[in-house]
């Protein structure tokens, strides 16, 4: 594998100098040769520097890197998360074929199906009004309390699928900052509100602090006895859930082989299911399952997650591009970049290989983005003319949900196409100068101004096109990126499924709380921390 990486690196200088405009001019079939589809989902990677030689090397890299072997180990239930001795089986949660999936010799599918059925019954009962609040009123608002994977996935998917909402209004609280829950509680009435507390251990500080605030909101308004009618939980800590006052019939579990950032398919998706209904939630799972099958069955050169991961690795570890911009041209995907930020950076933000040695080269990139066209008026300037090359990943639906606003969607499509073309072709000095002189600028001034209007081009982008953002399409898109992260992690030779990097700060925060509360001295901390504690204490008085 290292030899192939070195071969790729030996072409890096030439690759960076690749004139994509010339490449398209020389090859009328470039788009068809460097794009792949899964049903209506098209992935166009022709506007990257990938050519026939690089593609062959990337395919060989996947073979020698053991991506296919690791892929089958994941799907078969092997404990590939070796630092926690856990299988990685979020794919089992959307295993619509219902074929057996074994963990330690036991088929997990009966349990998966049982939880999914229980979720469906509960969601239907809330949506229909069969399950009411303590005063007999139907539930009109659902507030999910969670953080990280227990929040980002449900928030993102619920926003994305707004046209399919036909249940109670959905709200989400994550931040321990009291302002977050305070602002949400102003929008709802206690009598008609259901809280879902999502915490596997029921000990997550942010979640349980907000849950206690929510509990007080209900108890003070409706009495202690009302708590059981206004809460549900997604957790495995049944004793702690019972102590909180939540009926065991309203508790939905999941398993240690489901990582938080991969948990939207599990009971963590309950608020989404309540919003869009069990049938649409099933279609969401169907879309992901279709990508799982495609990932396992399609040859590398026709395999969307494989190609996306290989190109991502190439950009990061061969060409050295440090970031990746996620640019959905769909306002309802406004939280998709943040969702992928956690998925990618928490998975592949590692500095140690599976052997316990330092990573050779780079691991995962910084992932960020905003929906278009908003980003065009914010940070695209740097993507087009800045000194850093930032690979961009665009996504656009051919059809929107507002036929009466078709013209606006056509404007949206024209913008995303223009951005990908502009990044590829750029604008030469001669073109910039001619544009200025055609407007009447004299030659000398045009020579001075034109450099500021030059776009170097040759900036890589990938574009995804699909029919419409349905539950099926969203499930497909998420699973595509999950498997992309997996492919890159295998090539980085890291464990993509633990997250020890989140622990140290949490541990230190626990020790600092008594200091912040004034119960302990800050003397054992560094001078910066001592100074910050003192400054905050002074302002708080």
Curated annotation (Swiss-Prot):
> InterPro entries, per this entry?
G6P_Isomerase, G6P_Isomerase_C, Phosphoglucose_isomerase_CS, SIS_dom_sf, SIS_PGI_1, SIS_PGI_2
Q: Name one Pfam family in it.
A: PGI
**Where in the cell does this protein reside?**
Cytoplasm
One GO CC term on file: cytosol
Q: What is its main location?
A: cytoplasm
Name one process (GO BP) from the record: glucose 6-phosphate metabolic process
Q: From what superkingdom does this record's organism come?
A: Bacteria
The reaction(s) this protein catalyses: alpha-D-glucose 6-phosphate = beta-D-fructose 6-phosphate
Q: Its Gene Ontology molecular function terms?
A: carbohydrate derivative binding; glucose-6-phosphate isomerase activity; monosaccharide binding
**So, what pathway does this thing act in?**
Carbohydrate biosynthesis; gluconeogenesis; Carbohydrate degradation; glycolysis; D-glyceraldehyde 3-phosphate and glycerone phosphate from D-glucose: step 2/4
Which protein family is it in?
Answer: Belongs to the GPI family.
> What is this protein for, i.e. what is its function?
Catalyzes the reversible isomerization of glucose-6-phosphate to fructose-6-phosphate.
Q: What is this protein called?
A: Glucose-6-phosphate isomerase
Q: Which organism is it from?
A: Rhizobium etli (strain ATCC 51251 / DSM 11541 / JCM 21823 / NBRC 15573 / CFN 42)
Q: Which gene encodes it?
A: pgi
């Amino acid at each position: 594998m290292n030899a192939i990486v070195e071969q790729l690196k030996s072409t890096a200088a030439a690759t960076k100098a690749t004139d994509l405009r010339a490449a398209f001019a020389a090859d009328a079939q470039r788009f068809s040769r460097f794009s792949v589809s899964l049903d209506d989902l098209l992935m166009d990677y022709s506007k990257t520097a990938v050519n026939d030689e690089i593609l062959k090397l990337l395919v060989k890299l996947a073979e020698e890197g053991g991506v296919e072997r690791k892929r089958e180990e994941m799907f078969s239930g092997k404990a590939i998360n070796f630092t926690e001795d856990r299988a990685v089986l979020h794919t089992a949660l959307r295993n619509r074929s219902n074929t057996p999936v074994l963990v330690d010799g036991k088929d997990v599918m009966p349990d998966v199906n049982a939880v999914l059925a229980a979720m469906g019954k509960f969601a239907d009962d809330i949506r229909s009004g069969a399950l009411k609040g303590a005063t007999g009123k139907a539930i009109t608002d659902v507030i999910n309390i969670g953080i990280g994977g227990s929040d980002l996935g449900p928030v993102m998917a619920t926003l994305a699928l707004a046209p399919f909402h036909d249940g109670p209004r959905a709200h989400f609280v994550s931040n321990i900052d009291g302002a977050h829950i305070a602002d949400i509680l102003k929008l709802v009435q206690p009598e008609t509100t259901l809280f879902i507390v999502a915490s596997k251990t029921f000990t997550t500080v942010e979640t349980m602090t907000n849950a206690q605030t929510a509990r007080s909101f209900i108890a003070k308004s409706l009495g202690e006895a009302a708590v059981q009618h206004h809460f549900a939980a997604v957790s495995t800590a049944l004793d702690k859930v019972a102590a909180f006052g939540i009926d065991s019939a309203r508790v939905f579990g999941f398993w240690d082989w489901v990582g938080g950032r991969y948990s939207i398919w599990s009971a963590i998706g309950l608020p989404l299911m309540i919003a869009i209904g069990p049938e649409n939630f099933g279609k969401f799972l169907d879309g992901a399952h279709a990508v799982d099958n495609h990932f396992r069955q399609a040859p590398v050169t026709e395999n969307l997650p494989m190609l996306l991961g290989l190109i991502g690795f190439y950009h990061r570890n061969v060409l050295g591009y440090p970031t990746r911009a996620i640019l959905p041209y769909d306002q309802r995907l406004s939280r998709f970049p943040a969702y992928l930020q956690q998925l990618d950076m928490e998975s592949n933000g590692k500095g140690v290989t599976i052997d316990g040695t330092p990573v050779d080269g780079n691991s995962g990139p910084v992932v960020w983005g905003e929906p278009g066209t908003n980003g065009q008026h914010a940070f695209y300037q740097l993507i087009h003319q800045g000194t850093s090359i930032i690979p961009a990943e665009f996504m656009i639906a051919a059809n929107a949900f507002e036929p009466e606003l078709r013209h606006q969607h056509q404007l949206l499509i024209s913008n995303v196409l223009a951005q990908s073309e502009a990044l590829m072709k750029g604008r030469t000095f001669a073109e910039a100068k001619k544009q200025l002189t055609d407007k009447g600028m004299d030659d000398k001034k045009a020579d001075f101004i034109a450099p500021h209007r030059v776009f170097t081009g040759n900036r890589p982008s990938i574009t995804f096109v699909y029919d419409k953002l349905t539950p099926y399409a969203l499930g497909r898109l998420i699973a595509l990126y999950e498997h992309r992260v997996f492919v890159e992690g295998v090539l980085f030779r890291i464990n993509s499924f633990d997250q020890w990097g989140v622990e140290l700060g949490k541990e230190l925060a626990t020790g600092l709380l008594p200091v912040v509360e004034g119960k302990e001295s800050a003397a054992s901390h560094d001078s910066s921390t001592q100074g910050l504690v003192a400054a905050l204490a002074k302002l708080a008085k």
